Regions:
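A membrane-interface helix-boundary motif in multi-pass transporters
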Residues: 37-59, 253-272
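Extracytoplasmic gate region of multi-pass secondary transporters
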Residues: 102-152, 245-250
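A late C-terminal transmembrane helix in Major Facilitator Superfamily
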Residues: 227-259
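Cytoplasmic membrane-interface "Motif A"-like loop-to-helix N-cap segments
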Residues: 165-177
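Helix-to-loop junctions at the C-terminal end of transmembrane segments
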Residues: 156-168
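C-terminal ends and interior cores of transmembrane alpha-helices
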Residues: 178-193
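Glycine-rich segments within core transmembrane alpha-helices of 12-TM secondary carriers
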Residues: 11-36, 237-249
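Multi-pass alpha-helical transporter architecture, strongest
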Residues: 68-75, 271-292
Length: 292
């Protein structure tokens, strides 16, 4: 999407990646909220979701998988221009190319860590945490996820357009500063004033700030990498930053509660990831209008 977009529309084009994730989260929230309301009524059991109802969304996901495969196979690939110097191209391995851009890869990983930690905590963990530790009804957790999905979908498209007018780094910096400022107060407010309204308010605020930085981060990383290694480099950045620090975010957050014996402990993980991302901004330049 980034390579096929006009130079002044790359932000909006790339924003659809995060926007569709928000749409998927919204759909997941609707399904979870609907099942948590309908299954107990239909079966007469209040524990049906814990017993087997939680498997239903996974079954729906399996049914949707072929559609995703079909959509991916139907997309046109950007065929690179013929390589003029085959000998020079083949002698230079992908590994050596990555080494030449190792600073960009490291900065990309740090940027991705801040973005993905904030995304996983704000979109998915607040609701789960509130249900587990604050004894809030599970359907409020699903409602929080639904709200997060809607904000991500709408917000990503708006931020994408904003990227094209004000740049990437400024939005990332504002996002990171606000997430850092709000990370501990968000958990503290929920611990001291636990209510569904407070949960939804916290999710609304944190997801909004997270989305503000999520779109420009992924765009910036792809723009910093040269075309020859853009796919490989982005995959490496994504696998380390997202799969490890994002995929295990809820586990790390939960373990921090055990280690520090504090319900606000996940704020340290959220704040730490955010600080790493801000550190990378010091060494990253605003990309040129034309891609390499």
């Amino acid at each position: 999407m980034v390579e096929s977009a006009p130079a002044n529309r790359r932000g909006f084009y790339s924003s659809w990646s995060l926007a569709t994730q928000g749409l998927a989260t919204t759909f997941g929230g609707v399904v979870a909220l609907g099942l948590s309301a309908w299954l107990p009524f239909a079966t007469g059991s209040e524990t049906v979701m814990a017993e087997w109802g939680w498997r239903v969304p996974f079954f729906i996901g399996v049914l949707l998988a072929p559609i995703g495969c079909w959509l991916r196979l139907s997309l046109e690939n950007d065929v690179p221009e013929p390589v003029r110097n085959k000998k020079a191209a083949t002698s230079e391995s992908a590994f050596s190319l990555l080494l030449q851009h190792k600073a960009t890869i490291v900065n990309g990983v740090l940027l991705a860590i801040g973005s993905t930690v904030a995304t996983y905590i704000s979109l998915f963990y607040y609701g789960t945490w509130a249900a587990k530790y604050l004894a809030m009804p599970q359907h409020y957790s699903h409602a929080a996820m639904l709200l997060a999905g809607v904000i991500t979908f709408v917000g990503a498209l708006l931020v994408g357009m904003l990227c094209d007018s004000v740049g990437r780094k400024k939005l990332i910096l504002i996002s990171r500063v606000m997430v850092l400022i709000c990370s501990w107060p968000s958990f503290w407010l929920l611990v001291n004033y636990p209510s569904p309204g407070m949960l939804l308010t916290v999710v609304f605020v944190m997801v909004s700030f997270t989305t503000l930085g999520g779109v420009p981060v992924m765009l910036l990383i792809s723009e910093l990498l040269p075309k020859r290694i853009r796919a490989l480099g982005f995959a490496l950045v994504y696998s380390i930053g997202v799969a490890i620090f994002g995929g295990f975010a809820q586990y790390f957050a939960t373990q921090s509660i055990v280690l520090l014996d504090s319900l606000t402990a996940p704020a340290w993980y959220l704040g730490g990831g955010t600080l790493l991302s801000m550190l990378a901004l010091l060494y990253v330049k605003e990309p040129a209008k034309e891609l390499q």
